[in-house]
């Protein structure tokens, strides 16, 4: 008898962990299949979570009751708020993570998760029912020829589809060092007529920290009283460690340039496109030829692990070149190299093949998440996995509901919209600059933006829903008080505030918005607020400082939502729309946007083309 589940998630990386737990939370009987349980939660590249844009995604995952933020807080050994000197909208929390502790925490979480079964099995194929109008994926088959049936399947294969690693001319099949590759799933994806491409990523060598000379290197400490990723952080902060900063130099660059012909990236050996914002050191020397130095951040991999990750010198150069290059860097003259850096090529699916739910347009019941969608990064993968898992569960449970987020809801909405309307020609990485409504999409208010949506979708548990409701009530009460209470200029002056003596009374919220006014100042003037929660006070301070800008951005969002409200029928025939060139028709047919707003964001689409679509759709509805 076939093993039957509501949802099957293939892969135990960051996307798979979030997809499996999200599907289980939403009420689906869920199976996570991974080739090795001991590798669940593995951090394959850098030992860090968060950063600019990425920290926002972790907070959004947490707001939807995902697991990454809580697991990161259990394993964080250094916290830093990036862009601390800038506005709240562009600040990003980043943490160095103890790899072993993170992996252990994630495995413990998943192996005891309600509604979730975890089994070992290398998935080699999809079970496809082609009897209907559209193919439907109804299960998977493992290498051991064990079949599993499900109403929804979520693929989170990471770099494992036809994974090929490069160190100089040496090639090794695998999705990660000392790991296997999945050789047959791509064939099933192509059988479903999904467009498959090739991308590349890379990682630096790993170093023995005991053999590094830190004496002349710049120390980079973490923050003493750090913020945490999770709104639910209730675990003690671990002992915190320092990173160190060194740099390449002209000798390093001379070694690399003398061996550039041996670099797989430039010899024609690698065909996949790498991430623009995380280039290899050999790529940096080509793109920034005028620079004679690049920073190298020495990041510890754990509290009881001497391994160090040299962030900034990712490479696939031959081992002898890596050896000479690394030993030319200050502090690393006598370092022992534990293992060399490498590049990895892998298959991905053109993300314009997906709906906003992350289900494929050409096959029912098949959802894709993570690097398989053309992204790079743990945080991007985790966020996509969560949304795919929720929608896979909603479909399997036949709820007739979908869980989607748009560009005004969160960074996850921005990322999905970018992927499904623009596609990718290089691995996609999240930045705050990608979000046009970033003043409203701050990391501090991720729960206020998203948790209720998660409650409505069914993916937020009772404990978090209750905590969110309590915080929202406290926030609404304090905000209402600040907006209702007023003080005259004379009263404010007597309280120590510097104000214009125009006679105009000011609300508490307006006073809080004054430059250099702190929450402590407000409490002195309005003692009723003395017992306000710290997280509520922080959010009100930010709202007050930004209130003029926020009102303008809310007006922009209203206009955006108007375009998003106009749905384009799935079966629309773009060839019948007058005035569209063959090229524009081809672009529309490739993406098949779900809304007028999405149509306007497709690369190469003119306002005139959008107007033509609008007129045609309106006529269809008459």
Each predicted region: which residue ranges?
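Conserved beta-strand-loop-beta-strand element in the redox core of flavoprotein oxidoreductases
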Residues: 127-146
């Amino acid at each position: 008898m076939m093993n039957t589940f509501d949802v099957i998630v293939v892969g135990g990386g960051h996307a798979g962990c979030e997809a499996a737990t999200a599907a289980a939370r939403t009420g689906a009987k869920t199976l996570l299949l991974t080739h090795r349980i001991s590798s669940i939660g593995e951090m394959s590249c850098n030992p860090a979570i968060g950063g600019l844009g990425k920290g926002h995604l972790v907070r959004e995952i947490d707001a939807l009751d995902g697991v990454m933020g809580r697991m990161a807080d259990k394993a964080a050994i250094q916290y830093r708020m990036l862009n601390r000197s800038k506005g709240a909208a562009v600040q990003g929390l980043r943490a160095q993570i103890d790899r072993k502790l993170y992996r252990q925490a994630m495995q413990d979480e998943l192996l005891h998760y309600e509604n979730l079964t975890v089994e070992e099995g290398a998935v080699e194929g999809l079970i496809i029912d082609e009897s209907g109008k559209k193919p439907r994926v109804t299960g998977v088959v493992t290498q051991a020829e064990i079949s599993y049936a499900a109403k929804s399947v979520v693929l989170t294969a990471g770099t494992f589809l036809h994974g090929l690693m490069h160190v100089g001319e040496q090639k090794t099949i695998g999705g990660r060092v000392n790991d296997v590759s999945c050789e047959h799933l791509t064939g099933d994806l192509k059988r479903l007529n999904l467009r498959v491409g090739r991308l590349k990523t890379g990682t630096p060598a790993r170093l023995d920290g005991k053999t590094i000379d830190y004496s002349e290197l710049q120390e980079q400490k973490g923050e003493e009283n750090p913020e945490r990723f999770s709104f639910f952080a209730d675990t003690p902060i671990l002992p915190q460690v320092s990173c160190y900063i060194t740099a390449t130099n002209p000798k390093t660059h001379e070694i690399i340039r003398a061996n550039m012909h041996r670099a797989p990236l430039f010899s024609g050996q690698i065909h996949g496109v790498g991430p623009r914002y995380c280039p290899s050191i050999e790529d940096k020397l080509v793109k920034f030829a005028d620079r004679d130095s690049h920073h190298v951040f020495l990041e510890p991999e754990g509290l009881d692990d001497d391994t160090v990750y040299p962030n900034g010198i990712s490479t696939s150069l031959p081992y002898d070149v890596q050896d000479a290059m690394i030993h030319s860097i200050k502090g690393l003259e006598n370092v022992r190299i534990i293992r060399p850096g490498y590049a990895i090529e892998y298959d991905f699916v053109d993300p314009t093949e997906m709906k906003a739910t992350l289900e494929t347009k050409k096959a029912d019941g098949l959802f894709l998440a993570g690097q398989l969608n053309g992204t790079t990064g743990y945080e991007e993968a985790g966020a996509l996995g969560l949304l795919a898992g929720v929608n896979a569960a909603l479909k399997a449970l036949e709820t007739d509901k979908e869980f989607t987020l748009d560009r005004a809801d969160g960074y996850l909405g921005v990322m999905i919209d970018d992927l499904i309307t623009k596609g990718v020609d290089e691995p996609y990485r999240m930045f705050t600059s990608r979000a046009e409504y970033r003043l409203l999409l701050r990391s501090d208010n991720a729960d206020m933006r998203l948790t209720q949506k998660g409650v409505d979708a069914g993916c937020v548990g009772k404990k978090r829903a209750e905590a969110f409701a309590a915080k929202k009530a406290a926030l609404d009460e304090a905000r209402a008080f600040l907006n209702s209470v007023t003080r005259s200029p004379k009263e404010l002056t007597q309280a120590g505030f510097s104000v214009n003596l125009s006679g105009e009374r000011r609300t508490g919220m307006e006073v809080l918005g004054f430059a250099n006014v702190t929450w402590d100042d407000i409490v002195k003037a309005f003692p009723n607020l003395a017992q306000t929660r710290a997280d509520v006070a922080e959010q009100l301070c930010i709202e007050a400082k930004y209130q003029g800008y926020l009102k303008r951005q809310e007006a922009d969002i209203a206009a955006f939502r108007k375009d998003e409200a106009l749905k384009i029928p799935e079966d629309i025939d773009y060839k019948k729309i007058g005035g569209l060139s063959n090229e524009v028709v081809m672009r529309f047919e490739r993406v098949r946007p779900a809304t007028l707003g999405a149509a306007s964001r497709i690369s190469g689409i003119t306002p005139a083309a959008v107007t033509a679509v609008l007129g045609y759709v309106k006529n269809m509805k008459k």
